Curated annotation (Swiss-Prot):
It comes from the Bacteria. A zinc finger (C4-type) spans 761-787. CDD domains: ABC_UvrA_I, ABC_UvrA_II. It comes from Mesorhizobium japonicum (strain LMG 29417 / CECT 9101 / MAFF 303099). Forms a heterotetramer with UvrB during the search for lesions. It is found in: Cytoplasm. One of its GO terms (molecular function) is excinuclease ABC activity. The lineage of its organism: Bacteria, Pseudomonadati, Pseudomonadota, Alphaproteobacteria, Hyphomicrobiales. This is UvrABC system protein A. The UvrABC repair system catalyzes the recognition and processing of DNA lesions. UvrA is an ATPase and a DNA-binding protein. A damage recognition complex composed of 2 UvrA and 2 UvrB subunits scans DNA for abnormalities. When the presence of a lesion has been verified by UvrB, the UvrA molecules dissociate. Keywords: ATP-binding, Cytoplasm, DNA damage, DNA excision, DNA repair, DNA-binding, Excision nuclease, Metal-binding, Nucleotide-binding, Repeat, SOS response, Zinc, Zinc-finger.
Amino acid sequence: MADHKFLSIRGAREHNLKNVDLDLPRDSLIVMTGLSGSGKSSLAFDTIYAEGQRRYVESLSAYARQFLEMMQKPDVDQIDGLSPAISIEQKTTSKNPRSTVGTVTEIYDYMRLLFARVGVPYSPATGLPIESQTVSQMVDRVLALEEGTRLFLLAPIVRGRKGEYRKELLELQKKGFQRVKVDGVFYEIADVPALDKKYKHDIDVVVDRIVVRGDLATRLADSIETALKLAEGLAVAEFADKPLDSSQTGEDSVNKSKNETHERILFSEKFACPVSGFTIPEIEPRLFSFNNPFGACPTCDGLGSQRAIDPNLVVPDENVSLRDGAVSPWAKSTSPYYVQTLEALGKAYNFKLGDKFKDLSAEAQDAILRGTGEREVTFQYDDGLRSYKTTKTFEGVIPNLERRWKETESAWMREEIERFMSATPCPVCKGYRLKPEALAVKIGGKHIGEVTEQSIRNADKWFTDLPAQLNDKQNEIAVRVLKEIRERLRFLNDVGLDYLTLSRNSGTLSGGESQRIRLASQIGSGLTGVLYVLDEPSIGLHQRDNTRLLDTLKHLRDIGNTVIVVEHDEDAILHADYVVDMGPAAGIHGGEIIAQGTPQQVMANPNSITGKYLSGALEVATPGVRREAKKNRRLKIVGARGNNLKNVTAEIPLGTFTAVTGVSGGGKSTFLIETLFKAASRRIMGSREHPAEHDRIEGLEFLDKVIDIDQSPIGRTPRSNPATYTGAFTPIRDWFAGLPEAKARGYQPGRFSFNVKGGRCEACQGDGVIKIEMHFLPDVYVTCDVCHGKRYNRETLDVLFKGKSIADVLDMTVEEGVDFFAAVPGVRDKLDTLKQVGLGYIHIGQQATTLSGGEAQRIKLAKELSRKATGKTLYILDEPTTGLHFHDVAKLLEVLHELVDQGNTVVVIEHNLEVIKTADWVLDLGPEGGDGGGELVAQGTPEAIVREKRSYTGQFLKELLERRPGGKREAAE
């Protein structure tokens, strides 16, 4: 029998791997590291995970396989010792608005069960609990009263409804009932006065008169059953000798029955408020699901929000006059109608078109936006052809847009109007997504919506304290459910997500956050003997929380799993049981194993660049001198209050490299992206983005452009590639079209595009492959047998430059392209910027869909580098070191500092201390995440941050600045 202490890989050749042989210890924490593009993901995901998943899925029936995504068999000779594999990547966040942190982690499913089994419904009218009781419980409740207590047992058949009820009273008499209580007075049925049908009445039937004593159980049960049948599940026991004083009786108190003249006990065999009639169907878990019509708020369909016209988007800048376009939907229209409408309103409400919108009276602003109500205004219109006068009410800009949005059948018009809409909390469910019936059910004074609004840290405490508020029976029911909930909350705490709320939409999470959520779910599942493959779980995590994440990964290992992590984080590498260092460089220059073994063995290996950075032999240099703000110009953000920001005022010196730091959930993205970027792009670039709440931003006049270089894909189709995105493909096509052979044939640049007819291969339409659907086997992509994967037809491929066709050029790496086009500056310079940002290894025509987030971000950066510098641009980057090795970080910093040296301002959100230590200025937000964050903890140079006791960033930075002396800005080579 084979010994499976190792995971043995033989002859791995996927992508750039060069026939790799490797033995990995099972049940260990293994970190794969190395330069970007060196083959880490090819080995971990495309070989080991793909084969583990493929073998598991192949063991299922053909029927089951058709529902599962099948993996291609990787290019590898043999893998032994493989377990079923689970991959946790960053890309798979659900953008579905119905997906929340609670639903993704399954905590919400357990909460629904808890509220269905232990929750107590409360009447919205009285605030009192509504309980469903059996007849036996009702009998016991009466018999528990003091012996000799005199009671009337009543059936409330009419509660607060208009009518005469003659027919109903006659029916009761026929059934043998003799007395009723009508509007607070007892009558023989024959003597009931005629009731006025215009008024609301209360009628209770007297079913029995009782004096409490021990032998009453059988009679009482019969009488209660009779009352419940008559009153559709309700019964009342009224104390004959305990009248209420006048302040408590029906006439003077809201929602009470006029018959409530004495103290009474209300019984309900349904969940129904005996006072207001508010009823709840049987309480089941589906009542608390906002994805089920049984529980979802009918107004917003369980989304918690509605799109409505936003006055702040209709009038984006109140400092603009009406003539200059303060009313945005009307600003670009050439029709005289809108100006003449405003002139007429101006006469009626005493304003001129030259007035700024903010200087108009509240009444005038309201008339423009929401209409004149019942007040009529005289309008005079002249369109050049005819002139006419009319007196009418004015609808208002907002109601007009809302009406047109509902009535139009034009998709274009709908889209145009939607630019002035924003999501607002649903007015009925207040954003909780559920029906009133579901929100009436409470545990410990909170309904399910209020519990999900808490941060994970606070929810953990609430669920821990909950058993003390429950009775013995409730605790017995809840014990297992609470255990599951608390375990999952604890795991979320452990991976540094304690600041998130359970109601947070999962589409708004960063890649690192969503990956750690799935990691917490996996730990909750408690599987053993599994192979986990993770892709940089430390992304977006502050150094402070790194230890908790590593403890989580070690826990997965300790319960009997093999954990493979693709990671660049120094702590993760040093805590690994086994490290595999890929290299020596990227792309075609990588794909080999440079070093493997314990972290110490890798550090001792002279060939390992990773080892040199870990041991301190190589380092990202700390600059000797920090830049000052150019000409003392600064951006000042005043009173930022978005999300959890607490009135933050901070400065960013222009012409410097600034890092925004702080623990996860501290408010960095809200401050930089939601506030600064959106406000700046609105003011400078004229975008329609709506910034988070803030007072003002000073200093924007010194900028002419603001660019957010994010990690979203550069294209969503295989036809998009680095050459098309950076604009290098246009000069390449122009160059080929200018060659003598092409001119002789009359070819234009379009001949060399694989997107249009003419030069492309029509058999595969320029894709190079043909997709064949195989149903319960994976789709097979077969190389086109006409062009053999070249994408172009034979005639186009006949045009050669230096012996290479256009297809050969697209297949080159960027590095090869720079040398090949050395004499063609238009192409060389664009490709050279890609090489500068460390992407020399990618292919010029590589499909955009195969690029990682970090690679996409650096391609965007390269595009910016190739533009003509104005020296007045603000560049914003969110964690640009994602997916970067120490050595790549050093190269990236050179590029970012080059942008700053041109006079631009670069601001990054970053946790990587190697980047933070090279910054000229640091803004540290926090001190904690979520509710405990949102403050400016410190701002200044890295040295100033180190001196701030409350700053977690400062504490970790201090170690680094003390450990490594200052040097030149250049990265170590």
